[in-house]
């Protein structure tokens, strides 16, 4: 049962007998030691403008000094809470952990590379205060990104919009603000293969966007390589559409029709006693390769869905925590 959220004019939210902050800022971190100092200073300036706020940092198994720097920030500023994974579980799982532990009435997700400008947060808050349950940041320009990255991103979002069962806004990432009501619903979803921007669209409620120009990465290396981006794209399609399964059916029907057409042509040429252009070893090899490729594509599509079912039935936890601090402040 979903209950109405408390008044957004309140300066705090109560969870049982605990008084929590009004806002939670969630930032997943993986090998971001070069960005953390600047990230904190810019987030601190934003937090000082808002009502009671907590900053939830999730160390996703970093191999550099990120965890050490996060601990220092917690000692310096008690608004900083953190979780540290026992190993790297991935960006989407790190965001999920942040949502699990965030206590704010409004929860804001942003990345640590500063491509998502913290200074945009007050605009997200304004739209939330106007009555929207989800306010997502929508990119209108990608600074210093390659033409290949821009082209593939543009094509992917348009393809996803056409194939997905729900409308997922184009040119959006995880940078958004979500109402407590939405976060509580997301926390009830046990899916292992997470696609946060799709899940937040699926839950419904009033949603709107705030347009912005995405900045280049402040420092360090890009964490979303082509391989990881491709994996995320496949996961989003499989999680929110059954069209790939239908495509496998259509490919099978097309292959069957081509086989029937070839059979009719061969019979016609044989009966008419003309030289058949389909005679010969090469024709047989080409036909076998074509139909074999169709079968492998269909098996691959089925495998993606079956693999996700296998992940779900194993029932393992999404992540394991090695360390956490700051959340006891409000217990």
UniProtKB/Swiss-Prot annotation:
Keyword Protease listed: no
One Pfam entry name: Glycos_transf_2
Enzyme category, top tier: transferase
EC number per UniProt: 2.4.-.-
Transmembrane segments: 247-267, 281-301
Gene Ontology CC: plasma membrane
GO molecular function, one term: glycosyltransferase activity
Membrane-protein topology: Multi-pass membrane protein
Subcellular location: Cell membrane
Record-linked SUPFAM superfamilies: Nucleotide-diphospho-sugar transferases
Family designation: Belongs to the glycosyltransferase 2 family. GtrB subfamily.
Official protein name in the record: Uncharacterized glycosyltransferase slr1943
Organism per entry: Synechocystis sp. (strain ATCC 27184 / PCC 6803 / Kazusa)
């Amino acid at each position: 049962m979903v209950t109405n959220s408390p008044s957004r004019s309140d300066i705090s939210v109560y969870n049982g007998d605990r008084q929590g902050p009004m806002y939670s800022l969630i930032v997943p971190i993986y090998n971001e030691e070069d960005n953390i100092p600047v990230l904190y200073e810019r987030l601190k300036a934003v937090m000082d403008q808002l009502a009671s706020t907590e900053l939830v940092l999730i160390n996703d198994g970093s191999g550099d000094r990120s965890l050490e720097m996060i601990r220092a920030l917690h000692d310096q500023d008690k608004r900083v809470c953190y979780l540290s994974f026992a190993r790297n579980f991935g960006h989407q799982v790190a965001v999920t952990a942040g949502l699990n532990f965030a206590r704010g009435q409004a929860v804001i997700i942003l990345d640590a590379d500063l491509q998502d400008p913290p200074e945009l947060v007050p605009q997200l808050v304004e739209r939330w205060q106007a009555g929207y349950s989800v306010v997502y940041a929508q990119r209108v320009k990608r600074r210093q990104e390659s033409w290949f990255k821009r082209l593939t991103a543009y094509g992917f979002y348009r393809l996803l919009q056409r194939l997905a069962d729900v409308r997922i806004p184009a040119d959006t990432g995880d940078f958004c603000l979500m109402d407590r009501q939405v976060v509580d619903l997301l926390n009830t979803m046990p899916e292992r293969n997470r696609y946060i921007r799709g899940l937040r669209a699926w839950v419904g409620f009033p949603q709107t966007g705030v347009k912005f120009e995405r900045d280049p990465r402040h420092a360090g290396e890009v964490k979303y390589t082509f391989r990881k981006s491709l994996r995320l794209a496949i996961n989003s399609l499989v999680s929110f559409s059954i069209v790939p399964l239908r495509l496998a059916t259509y490919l099978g029907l097309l292959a069957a029709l081509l086989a029937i057409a070839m059979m009719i042509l061969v019979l016609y040429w044989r009966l008419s006693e003309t030289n058949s252009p389909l005679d010969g070893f090469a024709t047989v090899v080409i036909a076998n390769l074509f139909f074999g490729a169709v079968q492998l594509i269909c098996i691959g599509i089925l495998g993606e869905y079956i693999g996700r079912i296998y992940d779900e039935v194993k029932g393992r936890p999404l992540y394991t925590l090695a360390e956490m601090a700051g959340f006891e402040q409000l217990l």
